[in-house]
Amino acid sequence: MSHPDLFSLSGARALVTGASRGIGLTLAKGLARYGAEVVLNGRNAESLDSAQSGFEAEGLKASTAVFDVTDQDAVIDGVAAIERDMGPIDILINNAGIQRRAPLEEFSRKDWDDLMSTNVNAVFFVGQAVARHMIPRGRGKIVNICSVQSELARPGIAPYTATKGAVKNLTKGMATDWGRHGLQINGLAPGYFATEMTERLVADEEFTDWLCKRTPAGRWGQVEELVGAAVFLSSRASSFVNGQVLMVDGGITVSL
């Protein structure tokens, strides 16, 4: 096996949730550049169509699958439709996620429930639905998008931190249950990246100054810097890697 083949995704089909923008869209494009046939998932058809047009403008191809990852029945039906109409899902990037910020003592039940529904329940719903098809085939890659917030806490985002801690340990549980069937399930944990979700923090000079001093790399991450890790975890290069969470964080989790 040559070195390029080790990381090639040619012939593999990848479902990426929350793929209409941000990290999900960037990872989807990255997988496509390494040869994967990408299926973009989201709840909004117009947003997905726009994302698909962006693929075509860059000479890439993608299909779309509109369903709500927080609705288990919709997930089961959506995954089944992809398998039936497009072909087997070889790679799942469980990316869909949201953020809510407020002091913990003021945090609303609705915001708590929304976070749990999107950040935790959806990872289980989509992971389970896809794994049910992967297991009989004896192969498959699942990459759950985690966060450094599973290891670090900051004021105002305690519930988000709780959801990402849950995803980290759900990843380990998935690997324990499904590894025996030939699946590899791992996590990719971004540090502080400049995305739509972090626009307010990027614009906050005081926070950015603190972050750059706190991070050995001395800067915000750029979303394209997540692609290499995603390709590794999606490819044959990680065939004996299971239940791990790969931190892509510029070193912030190892620095005091």
Curated annotation (Swiss-Prot):
Signal peptide: none annotated. It comes from the Bacteria. SUPFAM superfamilies: NAD(P)-binding Rossmann-fold domains (SSF51735). The active site is at Y160. It is found in: Cytoplasm. Belongs to the short-chain dehydrogenases/reductases (SDR) family. This is Gluconate 5-dehydrogenase. It comes from Gluconobacter oxydans (strain 621H) (Gluconobacter suboxydans). The gene is gno.
